[in-house]
A protein has these predicted regions:
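Conserved nucleotide-binding/hydrolysis micro-motifs of P-loop NTPases
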Residues: 1, 16-19, 32-37, 93, ...
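Post-DEXD/H (motif II) to motif III coupling segment of the RecA-like Helicase ATP-binding lobe
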Residues: 1-29
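SF2 helicase motor core recognition
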Residues: 21, 136-154, 170-175
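Short, basic/glycine-rich phosphate-binding loops at helix/coil junctions
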Residues: 34-55
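Conserved strand-helix element at the start of the C-terminal RecA-like helicase core
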Residues: 55-103
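Conserved helicase ATPase core of P-loop NTP-dependent helicases/translocases
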Residues: 86, 95-143
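Conserved segment of the helicase C-terminal RecA-like domain
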Residues: 162-168, 172-204
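Non-catalytic, charged low-complexity extensions flanking SF2 helicase motor domains
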Residues: 205-212
Length: 212
């Protein structure tokens, strides 16, 4: 942007980029999540991270939720052997829980977070690309600026109020790659807290919608 006086020199809609094969097409599935978020503490316009983490990792229904996520992966993946995915989690503990659960059920996975060393991140990326692991479960990283074209599955494992974050995370799977026909997106949607504003979090003005 510095070369253009901090102005966009050009832009393209998401739909046009996909049609022109600049980005990968995607299939989006909203998957029912039986976890009830109605009683999770609401703080500063969002769910309390600790309470949400506890619900996803230590509650009675934590294993049941992880099992349903694994089933959805199997159901919506064209071939489980070819899956190379990123799962976006609410916390380090949640990412570690998901990776551990998948490893126990023969879906090799790694958890990464903002404290992970660069060599660990680079190693995880290589393993995902080569198929040595199926998933990277992450929090606070990989939202943007990460290039792993091989990613063909994206899991939204926590609610978000931010359209920007949602699009950034979706974008991790939109790069073109050899043998990659489309991206599979699984968004796990639960019963929300009554204060959760679906429209407010994802409302875009007319100009933004037109640019997509």
């Amino acid at each position: 942007l510095t070369y253009f006086d901090n102005r966009m020199a050009a832009e393209i809609r998401l739909s046009d980029a996909i049609e022109r094969r600049l980005l990968c097409p995607f299939h989006y599935f909203g998957v029912q999540d039986t976890t009830n978020l109605e009683n999770v503490k609401w703080t500063s316009g969002d769910y309390d991270i600790k309470e949400l983490t506890d619900l996803y990792t230590t509650s009675y229904g934590a294993d049941k939720r992880a099992y349903s996520i694994m089933n959805a992966i199997e159901q919506y993946s064209a071939d489980l052997r070819d899956v190379k995915g990123i799962g976006f989690c609410v916390s380090q503990k949640h990412a570690a829980f998901m990776a551990d659960y998948m490893n126990k059920h023969d879906l090799p996975s790694i958890a990464l977070d903002a404290n992970s060393k660069k060599e660990d991140r680079d190693g995880a990326k290589r393993k995902l690309e080569t198929g040595d692991i199926k998933f990277i479960f992450t929090v606070d990283i990989f939202n943007e600026g990460v290039d792993i074209p091989a990613v063909n599955t994206v899991l939204f494992l926590r609610p978000t109020n931010s359209m920007t974050v949602f699009i950034q995370q979706l974008g991790r799977g939109l790069r073109l790659d050899r043998g990659k026909d489309c991206l599979t997106v699984l968004d796990f949607v639960a019963q929300a807290n009554k204060k959760y504003n679906f429209a407010g979090g994802f409302m875009m003005d007319k100009q933004k919608i037109e640019r997509m």
